[in-house]
Amino acid sequence: MLMTMRKHGITLAVFAALATGLTALVNGLTTSTIERQAARQQMQLLDQVVPPDLYNNQLLDECYLVTDPALGSDAPHRLYLARKDGTPVAAAIETTAPDGYAGAIDLLVGADFSGNVLGARVTSHHETPGLGDKIELRLSDWITHFSGKSLRSDNDMSWAVKKEGGMFDQFTGATITPRAVMNAVKRTAGYLKKNLNALEKMPHCGDSSHE
């Protein structure tokens, strides 16, 4: 009887060890798959605001944490530095429009260091369906009109909605939302124009002391 109990105990221990190992393996594979999918989705978004033919480095490996009032909040924002043969040529940077109609609007903006906007996309918002939500690419191409626009100075009067004498369309029944997004893109382009030399001194994404 004692021998039988020992055999059962050993068998159970072996099965438990195998089950634990299999669970760890599955979890590891699942985590790796999720991380790859997240990286792929992030690159797809980055490609929309910084054309891939402009750079030849790995954007996800050149991620810095930037904190500045021009980016709309006190929270650190991720900045991805694009290089061509080692020379910085542009950046994609998270930014916030704090003054949306229904709260903060989060964006990703791509621009070079001369004030030229390469692209912009809204990543999160709470604007009114049917009105302010036209900032989403899936509902309107309005957000694409920032591509190719240039910021000559902080006081560039063309950076306004058309009803205020500027070059950007407002939405029917909704001016606050497009104005907020436009001003956020403007501030972000201005930030990149002024801060090229400071970017590489910023902490890297993943630095535990800044998370």
From Swiss-Prot:
InterPro entries: FMN-bd (IPR007329), Ion_transpt_RnfG/RsxG (IPR010209). It is found in: Cell inner membrane. Its EC number is 7.-.-.-. It is an enzyme of class 7 (translocase). GO terms for cellular component: plasma membrane. Its cofactor is FMN. GO terms for molecular function: electron transfer activity; FMN binding. The modification FMN phosphoryl threonine is found at residue 175. The chain crosses the membrane at residues 9-29. One of its GO terms (biological process) is electron transport chain. SMART domains: FMN_bind. Keywords: Cell inner membrane, Cell membrane, Electron transport, Flavoprotein, FMN, Membrane, Phosphoprotein, Translocase, Transmembrane, Transmembrane helix, Transport. Pfam families: FMN_bind. Belongs to the RnfG family. Part of a membrane-bound complex that couples electron transfer with translocation of ions across the membrane. The complex is composed of six subunits: RnfA, RnfB, RnfC, RnfD, RnfE and RnfG. This is Ion-translocating oxidoreductase complex subunit G. It comes from Sodalis glossinidius (strain morsitans).
